[in-house]
């Protein structure tokens, strides 16, 4: 089954593009928003409903409330695998009062809806795991529909049972066709379904608040998102291509956080002790003191403990990869430093296009730019070495110029966006001058135009 669980996967380094997971014995999910979340809800409503701040403010009327409600349900159960029509009917009063909930910060219904979702996930996973103890009949002709976005909600639990029976049967068949044996299939699927339930159980109140508030912001403007403080921190680190930590990418395997990669030049690499596959089981602050057992923790919670200000120390309790999960525990003290995430920066390579049909061979430079990154804080402080996509691309172009290439290709595939200023300035590396983007203010009589000019540092333009 293709699950759509709210999630955010941490690629850490203590870097981290978005994920979802938590303590094995996580505390009960809050039934209401915190005071800060209530205030935030009111502020976000004020910004998105005021023409001074929102380009196209949208009133929180019945139509918008219906849209927000739909988006919130989609963020939880987009494939309609957990809720029944009876659940949706039960939520109807919440849909009617969404405007009051957002304007006044009365967010309890959003948490109540999530509590039902969490309960339904537990029920469905329990049913799926029970099915794994039986045998499937593959002699009958049945159809399982993957794309359930436009189908109606299941009329009953019995209808969901049949959906999940077909889904589990389909999952089993796919593994069987891959050459897996029944015992291995049962083990694989049981773990898969248990992981789904665990990931939902580990969600916190701030996650639920983010899901709901983003249902509202996306209904008003599809390009507007609300970030929790931790998500905002991760975004800023991704844009600045740097972080303060030990310089290691982490991943979660079962209940343990494991070193996936040690980043060159970071404290962990300089120390040389940690290796890919090592399991982190405890974290402490400073040279001495208590160590917190982090087995079963959300990966982003472990990251938060390991990250910290430069020149401060963190202690890690870990099990070397070669010793297995029951191996001896070792302790390591590392001093945090600022680590540059060079692998996420612009990269260039030179390709040779062979001669063909009388045309001579050509040397072409290819620049891959994953994002229009910029260290916003570094630029604000006018730091000499702040991360900038434009600066890095300019250096690559200078190298290409010295090699006397015939042309340059700027590869923006998989580029997720980033700083608008960087996008405009980078364009100035390739054109003499001209409009790049128009920006229309909500109260302006006419749009203003952001214009690219030839970059002011003497870089020659290149065809693309």
Model segments located where?
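Bacterial N-terminal signal peptides that target proteins for export
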Residues: 1-9
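Bacterial N-terminal signal peptides
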Residues: 9-19
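Cleft-lining beta-strand/loop regions that shape enzyme active-site pockets
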Residues: 24-33, 51-61, 65, 198-205, ...
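N-terminal-proximal low-complexity accessory segments that begin disordered
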Residues: 33-76, 87
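Stable alpha-helical elements in mature extracytoplasmic
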Residues: 40, 44, 60, 64-65, ...
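PDZ/PDZ-like domain segments forming the peptide/carboxylate-binding groove
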Residues: 58, 74-75, 96, 110, ...
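AAA+ P-loop NTPase catalytic core
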Residues: 152, 156, 161-221, 225, ...
